[in-house]
Amino acid sequence: MFNILESESRMSEQENTITDECNIAFIVALKNAMNVINGKWKLAIVATMIKQPRRFNDIERLLQGITPRMISKELKELELNSVVMKIESIDPETGKKMAMYDLTESGRKLEGLMVQMATWGQMHRDDS
């Protein structure tokens, strides 16, 4: 398994040169992550669920400019990648089926990454 701390240590020891094995492991791990979160709306959808589970309509309301079709597509992909889970239940008021979406344990681990990305994004924009 790729260990970024080991590779950083190795890079400084080798005067910022990196071995082919480490470079490949890093790139594979990065591509794995990007395959899961890549897309215009995926991280925004995940962000809506950081504090609490959300209904489909909540996500649509919170993310102005996204179509219902795109929400559905992105949620399905996030479910397939075990980032989001769909929780179906019966609405006690109406007796109708309802669905909520919540983050899995793996999805919750994205919060720190998203905070770092948002911080970097703001600094990058301010520096430009």
Where are these regions (language model features)?
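Amphipathic alpha-helical dimerization/coiled-coil segments
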Residues: 2-18, 47, 102-128
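N-terminal helix-turn-helix DNA-binding core of bacterial DNA-binding proteins
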Residues: 25-70, 76, 90-100
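A short, conserved structural fragment
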Residues: 79-89
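Short, solvent-exposed charged binding patches
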Residues: 85, 100-101
